[in-house]
Amino acid sequence: MPSIFTNIILAFATALLGTLVFRSHLMSSLLCLEGMMLSLFTLSTLIILNMHLTMSFMMPILLLVFAACEAAIGLALLVMVSNTYGLDYIKNLSLLQC
């Protein structure tokens, strides 16, 4: 069982590293954030099932709901930015360019 936890933590660290490396593209950042949320969901589910915490069974579902809301808002932002500017570079976007 510890190898599963190690793999999930490694997946989270890889997604975090991907967020840091690909921070200039909005789509890549959103994909890495989704990977982080998926690994957090899996890790919290496994911890709750292994510890037999019956009061916390709803926590992973709540995390999954917030991840879906984050994905919907991120995709709406991506569509808005790509329709307005024609690209998804975060560095080129500035409020001073009006």
UniProtKB/Swiss-Prot annotation:
GO molecular function terms listed in the Swiss-Prot or TrEMBL record: NADH dehydrogenase (ubiquinone) activity
Keywords: Electron transport, Membrane, Mitochondrion, Mitochondrion inner membrane, NAD, Respiratory chain, Translocase, Transmembrane, Transmembrane helix, Transport, Ubiquinone
Superkingdom to which the source organism belongs: Eukaryota
Broadest EC class assigned to this enzyme: translocase
EC code(s) of this entry: 7.1.1.2
Biological process (GO), any one: ATP synthesis coupled electron transport
Membrane topology, as annotated: Multi-pass membrane protein
Cellular component annotations (GO), alphabetically ordered: mitochondrial inner membrane; respiratory chain complex I
Subcellular localization, as worded in the UniProt entry: Mitochondrion inner membrane
Catalyzed reaction equations: a ubiquinone + NADH + 5 H(+)(in) = a ubiquinol + NAD(+) + 4 H(+)(out)
Membrane-spanning ranges: 2-22, 29-49, 61-81
InterPro entries: NADH_UbQ_OxRdtase_chain4L/K (IPR001133), NUOK/Mnh_C1-like (IPR039428)
Keyword Magnesium: no
Keyword Transport: yes
Main location (coarse class): mitochondrion
Functional description taken from the UniProt entry: Core subunit of the mitochondrial membrane respiratory chain NADH dehydrogenase (Complex I) which catalyzes electron transfer from NADH through the respiratory chain, using ubiquinone as an electron acceptor. Part of the enzyme membrane arm which is embedded in the lipid bilayer and involved in proton translocation.
Subunit architecture: Core subunit of respiratory chain NADH dehydrogenase (Complex I) which is composed of 45 different subunits.
Family: Belongs to the complex I subunit 4L family.
Protein's name in the database: NADH-ubiquinone oxidoreductase chain 4L
Upper lineage: Eukaryota, Metazoa, Chordata, Craniata, Vertebrata
Gene expressing this chain: MT-ND4L
